[in-house]
Swiss-Prot record:
UniProt GO cellular component terms: cytosol
Keywords in alphabetical order: Aminoacyl-tRNA synthetase, ATP-binding, Coiled coil, Cytoplasm, Ligase, Nucleotide-binding, Protein biosynthesis
Residues annotated to bind ATP: 563
GO molecular function term, any single one: ATP binding
Predominant subcellular localization, coarse grouping: cytoplasm
Protein name as catalogued: Valine--tRNA ligase
Keyword Coiled coil: yes
Entry's localization field: Cytoplasm
Reactions catalysed: tRNA(Val) + L-valine + ATP = L-valyl-tRNA(Val) + AMP + diphosphate
Function in brief: Catalyzes the attachment of valine to tRNA(Val). As ValRS can inadvertently accommodate and process structurally similar amino acids such as threonine, to avoid such errors, it has a 'posttransfer' editing activity that hydrolyzes mischarged Thr-tRNA(Val) in a tRNA-dependent manner.
Enzyme class: ligase
Length: 954
């Protein structure tokens, strides 16, 4: 029985992918089975911010996650990929504030809190939908009915529950402390949201008069204090010297008069002071500097806050003791002339006033790092504010132990050290933010300022016996976005309820994330999860067993992708394509720095003169997997993307060759397996083993290489060719065997490839399954190929390997000698071992057809051979007589010309690379390209010289 199928000339990704995905989703193939008898496998997606669209980093990480989910689903595991989005407090509020400012010329205050939050929910509905659709285009096999948002009702309940319990345990407290304050966004931000920028500044040297007639060792009646922040002078509460600095030892415990404010402040000794910095005397301003804050605590200094939340000088100083309570016994009046001044205007005035008083010693240029808020984009101010904190040290101990004892493993392992360094030096976590968008802090205040924490106002009243006559107001602040994200693995599964999902899918198996949020998110998830989730024996549960840390995706030059550089590539543009005009509009529109638009447009036109061609999702996924070397950053390469699109086409064409073959015979008669049939089964079996080992160790790059190597170099380039003589001249039994092997290896290959390239494999599998006698609705629930000891066949692999080497050697001789493929050659073999002689006898006809040989002869040891081109294969010498095929002199002249040309190219590049100025100035990528060219030219030169010698010896 022969079978034949009609198949399109090429795979049309744009026509197939979305239709296939819709079919999968409608059929419910992505849902977990909830079969308790199966092993569970789950991944919680790092929730993308609801603020915008997916970028290459998302596409990269989600491709790896989906690969693992599909791989485990095909192994029969009960799989859950828990997806969702993050409310992203500051980022989302900023986006919507900018939107209403641009479109309506309004601020959030014009709307009021409730109406503004409604605006954000509208934005979330729009933006969240965009992200979900983009994730579908990537082929992500997510159970969309379980999609979550960090401010869903269920997750909000979990957040309140955690806050209340931690507060009851004394691990959440409210206190006045120094925080990073963003004066533009009016909120506290974490250290990790602060970007230190190099800046050319000044170091001002001010004279602080000594009080009560004191003098320095040199007889001066003042100390010179060096500072980079004159605007905070009014908040000084001490000056400090190093306790071992002999210049000032006699002055320790005495006082200076603070200029402008005219109050006495002490001279304290503290090892924090660097004797080499400035004069070795520094001013201490505990309310406006983190180091000074610590010095102030050590010396019990008052904290004088002279700035408003706008970073203007206050009308009246706020004076706080080291216990965080108001201090009424200390006086620090702000002079009238400074009140209400913007901070940098105040700086100028302070310097001018010191100068006019004769107290400005000198000004020095000084390089410094200025801390900026990464979202607000303005210098942050250390600010004394009332904030909520989590005391994390007790939580950190358990989390450190989990990694030390191997309950959680980092891949690559080096990231464990980064984790430990953060966790062993952990500070209390400021969890309150002065925003409107987010989880509102579940705390209420009465008119006397008493604080009540509870899950709701009703609970607070009931628990504390507060009737309706007691007025309560809820805390205005919201929680840090990372607080709710830290609960992600268990809150999405229904906690605090004890759901079947929580029992079945927690802990999750792996977290795939970037190194930049190991502390922001990973560490906090470990701490929170282990504190709240316990197994049946009361042992803390980890949120995940493995943390796979990815590198960054950079552009082809190794630059980080960013809007300001104009080098961002949208993953969907590589899938669907984009014309140049639209690409330019995307890269240069809505820029924070519009002056860069022209430069970006020029670079884009050079890189993508025709825009970006469509490549389809499978090609993008395969490229991302192939580039995923463990933990390393990836330099994006469009040529690799094109190459892997060609790979997908190769798989399609190979399938088309098999399924449209007129001679294909899958009838039930006798089958006589050829050497090639046994070989391809053994090779595929080995590929399955290597592929599975690679994925089990998160080596997506090695898995992709295995798949590519087998599909292109073994199945397509060799096995399909080796079957052609069988279909042309074989017996019925041999044709049936080749047909059976072709179809069955192809069907298994599609299953092997499915986790990486789901669309094309499903499309082909739907056509091949009937040929292979396989039942099932979809490839994604078919069993994943397993290694089979019975298919190991080292003998067949060795024999075909030798046959391939001989055929390749003959083909190389033909190409090197410019002999047309239509001309038959004779092959002489000398020193042929017995095993290879036997292989030759059994496969002589096949080898003659494949290498286009008229004859094959084994020479005796002492038998003379005519003038021939020779190659070695193992210990055997291959000789192809050249008489009548080439004109020796003409061929040598041609080769000599080619050799001279390459020598010239090598010298040119040697000159470039030997030029120190070029090497110093040229980008690394350009130098690497030149070295690569040099290697190619040198290898080419070697081959040409070898050809020259071969022909010269004829």
């Amino acid at each position: 029985m022969t079978q034949k199928l009609q198949m399109a000339d090429r795979f049309d990704a744009s026509a197939v992918e979305q239709a296939l995905y819709n079919h999968w989703e409608q059929k419910g193939y992505f849902k977990p089975s909830y079969d308790a008898g199966r092993p569970s496998y789950s991944i919680a997606i790092p929730p993308p911010n609801v603020t915008g669209s997916l970028h290459m980093g998302h596409a990269f990480q989600q491709t790896l996650m989906d690969t693992l989910i599909r791989y485990h689903r095909m192994q029969g595991d009960n799989t859950l990929w828990q997806a969702g989005t993050d409310h992203a407090g500051i980022a989302t509020q900023m986006v919507v504030e900018r939107k209403i400012a641009a479109e309506e010329n309004k601020t959030r205050h014009d709307y009021g809190r409730e109406a503004f939050i409604e605006k954000i929910w509208d934005w979330k509905a729009y933006s969240g939908g965009t992200i979900s659709q983009q994730m579908r285009r990537l082929g992500n096999s997510i159970d969309w009915e379980r999609e979550r948002f960090t401010m869903d009702e269920g997750l909000s309940e979990a957040v309140k529950e955690v806050f209340v319990r931690l507060h009851e345990e004394g691990l959440i407290y409210r206190g006045k402390r120094l925080v990073n304050w963003d004066p533009k966004l009016h909120t506290a931000i974490s250290d990790l949201e602060v970007e230190n920028k190099e800046s050319k500044g000044s170091l001002w040297h001010f004279r602080y008069p000594l009080a009560k007639g004191a003098k320095t060792a040199e007889g001066l009646d003042y100390l010179v204090v060096a500072t980079t922040r004159p605007e905070t002078v009014l908040g000084d509460t001490a000056v400090a010297v190093h306790p071992e600095d002999e210049r000032y030892q006699s002055l320790i415990g005495k006082t200076v008069v603070l200029p402008l404010a005219n109050r006495e402040i002490p001279i304290v000794a503290d090892e924090y002071v660097d004797r080499e910095f400035g004069t070795g005397v520094v001013k201490i301003t505990p309310a406006h500097d983190f180091n000074d804050y610590e010095v102030g605590k050590r010396h019990n200094l008052p904290m004088v806050n002279v700035m408003t939340f706008n970073a203007d000088i206050r009308e009246e100083a706020e004076i706080i003791g080291t216990d965080g309570q108001p201090l009424t016994t200390y006086e620090a009046e702000i002079p009238q002339d400074y009140r209400g001044l913007e901070r940098f205007a105040a700086r100028k005035k302070v310097v001018a006033d010191f100068d006019s008083l004769g107290l400005l010693e000198k000004i020095q240029p000084h390089d410094l790092k200025v801390p900026y808020g990464d979202r607000g984009g303005v210098p942050i101010e250390p600010m004394l504010t009332d904030q909520w904190y989590v005391s994390v040290k007790p939580l950190a101990e358990t989390a450190i132990k989990a990694v030390e004892e191997g309950e959680i493993q980092f891949v690559p392992k080096q990231y464990e050290n980064l984790y430990y360094s953060w966790m062993r030096d952990i500070q209390d976590w400021c969890i309150s933010r002065q925003l409107w968008w987010g989880h509102r802090i579940p705390a209420w205040y009465d008119e006397q300022g008493n604080v009540y924490v509870g899950r709701s106002e009703e609970e607070v009243r009931s628990k504390n016996g507060l009737n309706s006559s007691v007025a309560l107001r809820q805390d205005e602040d919201v929680l840090d976005t990372w607080f709710s994200s830290a609960l992600w693995t268990f809150s999405t599964l229904g906690w605090p309820q004890q759901t079947k999902e929580l029992a079945m899918f927690h802990p999750t198996n792996v977290l795939i994330t970037g190194f930049d949020i190991i502390f922001f998110w990973v560490a906090r998830m470990i701490m929170m999860t282990m504190h709240f989730i316990k197994d049946e024996n009361g042992k803390p549960q980890v949120p995940f067993k493995t943390v796979y840390v990815t590198g960054l995706i950079r552009d082809e030059q190794g630059q980080k992708m960013s809007k300001s550089k104009g080098n961002v590539i949208d993953p969907l543009d590589m899938i669907d394509g984009i014309d140049l005009e639209s690409l330019l509009a995307k890269r240069t529109g809505n820029m924070m720095q519009p002056q860069l638009a022209e430069k970006i447009a020029k670079a884009t036109k050079k890189e993508f003169p025709e825009g970006i061609q469509p490549h389809g999702t499978d090609a993008l996924r395969f490229t991302l997997s192939a580039l995923a070397s463990t933990g390393r950053d990836i330099n994006w390469d469009m040529k690799r993307l094109e190459g892997y699109r060609n790979f997908c086409n190769k798989l399609w064409n190979a399938s088309r060759f098999v399924l449209t073959n007129d001679k294909l015979d899958l009838s039930t008669g006798e089958r006589e397996l050829s050497l090639a049939d046994k070989w391809i089964q053994a090779e595929f079996n080995k590929t399955v083993q290597n592929f599975r080992n690679a994925l089990d160790q998160y080596r997506f790059d090695l898995a992709a290489t295995e798949l590519y190597e087998f599909t292109w170099n073994q199945f397509c380039d060799w096995y399909l060719e080796l079957t052609k003589p069988v279909f042309a001249n074989g017996t019925d039994a041999q044709i049936r065997a080749a047909s059976f092997t072709l179809v069955n290896v192809l069907e298994k290959l599609l299953r092997l490839a499915h986790p990486l390239i789901p669309f094309i494999t499903e499309e082909i599998w739907q056509k091949v399954k009937d040929f292979a006698g396989v039942e099932g609705e979809t490839i994604m629930t078919q069993p994943f190929p397993a290694f089979d000891e019975a298919l190991v066949n080292d003998e067949a692999v060795a024999q075909i390997s030798w046959i391939k080497e001989v055929i390749t050697a003959v083909r190389n001789i033909r190409a090197e000698s410019n002999i047309a493929p239509s001309k038959g050659l004779d092959l002489l073999l000398r020193n042929l071992p017995d095993t290879e002689q036997k292989t030759l006898e059994n496969n002589r006809t096949l080898m003659q057809i494949m290498a286009k040989l008229d004859s094959v002869k084994v020479l005796a040891q002492d038998e003379e051979a005519p003038l021939s081109v020779a190659k070695l294969v193992g210990s055997a010498e291959l000789l192809v007589p050249m008489a009548g095929f080439i004109n020796k002199d003409t061929e040598l002249a041609r080769l000599n010309k080619e050799i001279e040309k390459l020598i010239g190219e090598v010298k040119r590049i040697e000159g470039k690379l030997g030029n120190e100025a070029f090497v110093a100035k040229a980008p690394e990528a350009v130098i690497a390209k030149e070295r690569e060219k040099m290697q190619d030219y040198q290898e080419g030169l070697e081959k040409l010289r070898a050809q020259y010698l071969s022909i010269e010896n004829l």
